[in-house]
């Protein structure tokens, strides 16, 4: 293994100067400590009668932004969840072999007859450490502010561990947390919580190294990705995934079909259920938290897909369609779905039911093929729930703005309220180079309607494999989309950050403005460049270079 670049480390001063520190909140039910980032403000701002000289921020960076933690990527992160000692009586070692990192780890699985999923515990009325963790995390230590916030004619209520349990039990939310991913800091995906975003990484046959992919994963977390999907299709798929998992504080998802296809020599016709099953188990033992499985595409859908302008654009969907046509048999992911669920149940892996027939252009949006598959995904949702497996549903894709709402409405109707996870949607087909913005526009709208998680798109979408800088652009732009949707849905903690930004802007508190933004580094750089270009390098003026000292409207409005 080559030495990792120093760039994998993300000290806080790179983003927030000296204004930020890592803080932890202890649980009341379980021995947990929830990490957040507390941002100190240069001024004290009063919002709804509450004074704020600092604000806790939701933090996805894990220990990477904690200067008190020494991290060696070749050993991986500390196994946070092992300390909670929950669920041990229901699990057993798979084998005595450790993984491929320096830190030896014995994979676990559920004992025979036991269910170790968050859904199973929630249905029994049991609050797990993960449930308490996400309740504390969603509140951000802002219970007083939340309780003062008016919404729907009444004040909001802080999240409780019991509310989290109820949402998971009802299938409206999932906590993806494989028992073999102890480095994970639990998070929740559901429409009654903060809108989350996912960042896709992974090598391809065209290039990228293990080190580059681990670095992308770490920086995706640092910039705000709530989950990361490793979509590697090149060489060293197993090793790449192992290193990402051992160094990831966020849930990791995969599409197991990609590795199964590699094992089949890249020939879809050579795939078998047994080969795919073994791949599921291999990845389950490594610690993958959720699988995208394209079990909803059936032979009956293929004629409608064949009439499309751009056919099948999902890689997993195209693989299964090819297999079905060549072998003249039904999708083995569908016919073996019960067995798939039993595997997932043994490790608490959530299933992300893949949209193999998502539209690849706006002309194909909301067509017979797309909604035919969605109906099957709803049926599979009920079947997965019978096995105590957590479920979310994947969605499009390319959808014109006027058809976005119908996607959300159909998903809720056909999939029984399971969380929706969409790729955008992209609302036009002509934004090459700017598809991250294209995606964020559609993503904002569908998230405001109730979508739980947005899959980011980078500027390289449709053009090439993204690098670290593309990952940053994609993550931040989709954080804007998710945050805008949270505002529209009345999320009190999201609103507070905007209100503090507005007050800082009116007070010309430049450092607070930088630090309260979603990309403090870029805000600070653009400000400095603009000041330098105008010859102003000293002090923090009560105006910006856009208006200058004589035309600043905020300055004028404060004059007596």
Swiss-Prot record:
Please name the InterPro entries in this protein's record: ThiC, ThiC-associated_dom, ThiC/Bza_core_dom, ThiC/BzaA/B
Record EC number: 4.1.99.17
This entry's comment on the bound cofactor is: Binds 1 [4Fe-4S] cluster per subunit. The cluster is coordinated with 3 cysteines and an exchangeable S-adenosyl-L-methionine.
**Keywords of this protein's UniProt record, alphabetized?**
4Fe-4S, Iron, Iron-sulfur, Lyase, Metal-binding, S-adenosyl-L-methionine, Thiamine biosynthesis, Zinc
Name the Gene Ontology biological process terms: thiamine biosynthetic process; thiamine diphosphate biosynthetic process
Report one GO cellular component.
Answer: cytosol
Per UniProt, Zn(2+) binds at 398, 462
Q: What does the entry list as the binding residues for substrate?
A: 200, 229, 258, 294, 314-316, 355-358, 394, 421
Q: Which cofactor does it need?
A: [4Fe-4S] cluster
Q: In which pathway does it act?
A: Cofactor biosynthesis; thiamine diphosphate biosynthesis
Pfam family for this entry, one? ThiC-associated
Ranges in a coiled coil: none
Q: State the Gene Ontology terms under molecular function.
A: 4 iron, 4 sulfur cluster binding; carbon-carbon lyase activity; zinc ion binding
Q: Which reaction does it catalyse?
A: 5-amino-1-(5-phospho-beta-D-ribosyl)imidazole + S-adenosyl-L-methionine = 4-amino-2-methyl-5-(phosphooxymethyl)pyrimidine + CO + 5'-deoxyadenosine + formate + L-methionine + 3 H(+)
- Top-rank taxon, per record: Bacteria
Q: Per the record's keyword annotation, is Iron included, yes or no? A: yes
**Can you tell me which residues bind [4Fe-4S] cluster?**
544, 547, 552
Family of this protein: Belongs to the ThiC family.
Its biological purpose: Catalyzes the synthesis of the hydroxymethylpyrimidine phosphate (HMP-P) moiety of thiamine from aminoimidazole ribotide (AIR) in a radical S-adenosyl-L-methionine (SAM)-dependent reaction.
Q: What is the name of this protein?
A: Phosphomethylpyrimidine synthase
């Amino acid at each position: 293994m080559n030495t990792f670049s120093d760039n994998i480390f993300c000290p806080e001063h790179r983003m927030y100067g000296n204004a930020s520190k890592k803080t932890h909140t202890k649980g009341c039910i379980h021995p947990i400590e929830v990490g957040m980032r507390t941002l100190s403000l240069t001024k004290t701002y009063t919002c709804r009668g509450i004074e704020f000289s600092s604000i806790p921020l939701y933090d996805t960076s894990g220990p990477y932004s904690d200067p008190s933690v020494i991290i060696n990527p070749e050993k991986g992160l500390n196994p946070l969840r092992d300390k909670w000692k929950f669920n041990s009586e229901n699990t057993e070692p798979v084998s005595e072999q450790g993984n491929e990192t320096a830190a030896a780890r014995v994979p676990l699985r559920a004992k025979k007859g036991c269910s170790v999923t968050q859904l199973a515990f929630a249905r029994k009325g049991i609050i797990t450490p993960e449930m308490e963790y996400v309740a504390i995390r969603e509140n951000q230590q802002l219970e007083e502010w939340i309780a003062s916030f008016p919404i729907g004619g009444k004040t909001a209520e802080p999240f409780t561990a019991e509310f989290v349990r109820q949402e998971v039990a009802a299938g409206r939310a999932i906590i993806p947390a494989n028992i073999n991913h102890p480095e994970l800091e639990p998070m929740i995906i559901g429409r009654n919580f903060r809108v989350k975003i996912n960042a896709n990484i992974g090598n391809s046959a065209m290039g990228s190294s293990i080190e580059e992919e681990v670095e992308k994963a770490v920086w995706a977390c640092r910039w705000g990705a709530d989950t990361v999907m490793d979509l590697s299709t090149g060489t060293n798929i197993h090793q790449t995934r192992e290193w990402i998992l051992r160094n990831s504080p966020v849930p990791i998802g995969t599409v197991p079909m990609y590795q199964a296809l590699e094992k089949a020599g890249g020939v879809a016709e050579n795939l078998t259920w047994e080969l795919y099953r073994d791949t599921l188990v291999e990845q389950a033992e490594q610690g993958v938290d959720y699988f995208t499985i394209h079990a909803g595409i059936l032979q009956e859908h293929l004629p409608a897909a064949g009439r499309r302008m751009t056919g099948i654009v999902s890689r997993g969907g195209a693989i299964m369609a090819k297999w079905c046509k060549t072998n003249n048999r039904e999708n083995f992911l569908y016919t073996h779905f019960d067995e798939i669920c039993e595997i997932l149940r043994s490790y608490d892996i959530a299933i992300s039911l893949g949209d193999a027939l998502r539209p690849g252009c706006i002309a194909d949006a909301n067509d017979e093929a797309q909604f035919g598959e969605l109906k099957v995904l709803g049926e599979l949702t009920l079947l997965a729930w019978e096995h105590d497996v957590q479920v979310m549903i994947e969605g499009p894709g390319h959808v014109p703005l006027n058809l976005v709402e119908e996607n959300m409405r159909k998903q809720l109707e056909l999939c029984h309220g399971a969380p929706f996870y969409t790729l955008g949607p992209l609302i036009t087909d002509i934004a090459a180079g700017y598809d991250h913005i294209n995606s964020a526009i559609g993503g904002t709208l569908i998230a405001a309607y109730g979508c739980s998680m947005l899959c980011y798109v980078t500027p390289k979408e449709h053009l090439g494999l993204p690098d670290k800088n593309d990952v940053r652009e994609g993550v931040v732009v989709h954080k804007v989309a998710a945050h805008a949707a949270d505002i529209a849905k009345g999320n009190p903690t999201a609103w507070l950050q905007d209100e503090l930004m507005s007050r800082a802007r009116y007070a010309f508190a430049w450092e607070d403005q930088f630090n309260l933004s979603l990309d403090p580094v870029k805000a600070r750089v653009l400000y400095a460049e603009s000041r330098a270009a105008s010859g102003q390098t000293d002090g923090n003026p009560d105006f910006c270079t856009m208006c200058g000292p004589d035309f600043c409207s905020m300055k004028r409005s404060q004059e007596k």
